[in-house]
Amino acid sequence: MIPQEFQERMQQMLGDEYEAFLQGYDKPRFHALRRNPLKIEEKDFLEKVPYELKPVPWAQHGYYYKHEDQPGKHPFHEAGVYYIQEPSAMSVVEYLEVKPGEQVLDLCAAPGGKTTQIA
């Protein structure tokens, strides 16, 4: 159940787009992970990861996986080969377009997914 106060605030902010926003809550959730390019090349990653992955269109190293795969239990996750992250969270760094040598202060860096993506 979505709190009434939140619904009212979102309706005020979104106007005509509010109904589409609400419909999003009735759709299935997407699950994704992000490959760590500092740890493994894409070709090797796709050959070694035991899941059927589909690219996240807006995230250079992002992939959708099936919920039942549970990649958080695989040793690659613990080794930092990939990071489990919401696909929408990946878009933030992609749109930021950080260039080498630039510095970024992530004021909301917990647990640090976007920070590792910037690295």
Predicted stretch roles:
Residues 1-119:
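S-adenosylmethionine
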